[in-house]
Amino acid sequence: MSRELHDVDLAEVKPLVEKGESITGLLQEFDVQEQDIETLHGSLHVTLCGTPKGNRPVILTYHDIGMNHKTCYNPLFNSEDMQEITQHFAVCHVDAPGQQDGAPSFPVGYMYPSMDQLAEMLPGVLHKFGLKSVIGMGTGAGAYILTRFALNNPEMVEGLVLMNVNPCAEGWMDWAASKISGWTQALPDMVVSHLFGKEEIHSNVEVVHTYRQHILNDMNPSNLHLFISAYNSRRDLEIERPMPGTHTVTLQCPALLVVGDNSPAVDAVVECNSKLDPTKTTLLKMADCGGLPQISQPAKLAEAFKYFVQGMGYMPSASMTRLMRSRTASGSSVTSLEGTRSRSHTSEGPRSRSHTSEGSRSRSHTSEDARLNITPSSGATGNNAGPKSMEVSC
């Protein structure tokens, strides 16, 4: 039976960053602890916001290259829609070595940790604060690190929200191009092209300029180069979609994969989705969104995160947010998304493993998803007749 669907235009109430406002100056008032924690592979700058609550997990964030926890996550966690969530969860922000504000340069000859070693440093953070488990939120390089952490320590990770995650090693051509171009002059351009899509660079000039200036003026360039080199030298995560009767390496926890439909990371995220357990994984493609959904559309991402944690059994009485109210008021129906789903992009043959691929992509939205319903089927097993992974667009 056909049903009429309605698109709802959701505009942000106010600009993300007001003119003259620093993107590093948006920290919400919390009980904040900042510490440099010694770990297995060196020191990490960690910021704990709020007080851990009993046996409830803490939200653990990890940022992308060219950013730190403030520039990557403050706009999201300071948004009105995240306030209800942060009342229920403490938040632990991790800065990669040397990426925090005011970080001194590493000494000559310093060996920066590999991506695997950066993941191995995180259990030390949990032990320092007495944390038993976390819900990870990572972007780009941070998403890779948190995925590796969850693969190594499944008992410590209850869920993952992964934005712009790339499960694959850097392609040879991309590695060679980055080496040939040099990094002194091209460093801001390299980072901007990683964070933002081509269309976004030309259409969202003010935000892109703000982040370019942050890279030039606030980041330690030698430290940033070391982090970029570590990310470009990453190994393939070697995850595989589980099949009945086989032993595969995959995430054991629920995962929400998030990507903007104009992001340079679309192909990589879709490939990651194809490698994960469909009964525990949701792919959220955000319409009219570029490379940083937590920056450009924090309200939508906050609601998606709320549904995600509700699916894990937390915040059962959380209030309706404006996205749900808008969609409900439009007359759209609510679907549970059970049963086999069409998964666009995942069966189109080999695709580029680079974040810079800008080939033609299908922009079709799975519009039967009348509401953001991203609760995974917690009782599903590999023996079920069809996959229950979900691809939703908003």
Curated annotation (Swiss-Prot):
InterPro entries: AB_hydrolase_fold, NDRG. Residues 327-339, 374-386 have a biased composition (Polar residues). Interacts with RAB4A (membrane-bound form); the interaction involves NDRG1 in vesicular recycling of CDH1. Interacts with APOA1, APOA2, PRA1 and RTN1. Residues 325-394 are annotated as: Disordered. Sequence repeats lie at residues 339-348, 349-358, 359-368. The gene is Ndrg1. It comes from the Eukaryota. Belongs to the NDRG family. The modification Phosphoserine is found at residues 2, 319, 326, 330, 332-333, 336, 342, 352, 362, 364. Its main location: cytoplasm. Stress-responsive protein involved in hormone responses, cell growth, and differentiation. Acts as a tumor suppressor in many cell types. Necessary but not sufficient for p53/TP53-mediated caspase activation and apoptosis. Has a role in cell trafficking notably of the Schwann cell and is necessary for the maintenance and development of the peripheral nerve myelin sheath. Required for vesicular recycling of CDH1 and TF. May also function in lipid trafficking. Protects cells from spindle disruption damage. Functions in p53/TP53-dependent mitotic spindle checkpoint. Residues 339-368 are annotated as: 3 X 10 AA tandem repeats of G-[PST]-R-S-R-S-H-T-S-E. The keyword Glycoprotein does not apply. The modification N-acetylserine is found at residue 2. It comes from Rattus norvegicus. Residues 345-371 have a biased composition (Basic and acidic residues). Pfam families: Ndr. PANTHER family: N-MYC DOWNSTREAM REGULATED. GO terms for cellular component: adherens junction; centrosome; cytoplasm; cytosol; microtubule; nucleus; perinuclear region of cytoplasm; plasma membrane. It is found in: Cytoplasm, Cytosol; Cytoplasm, Cytoskeleton, Microtubule organizing center, Centrosome; Nucleus; Cell membrane. The modification Phosphothreonine is found at residues 328, 335, 340, 346, 356, 366, 375. GO terms for biological process: cellular response to hypoxia; DNA damage response, signal transduction by p53 class mediator; mast cell activation; negative regulation of cell population proliferation; peripheral nervous system myelin maintenance; signal transduction. This is Protein NDRG1.
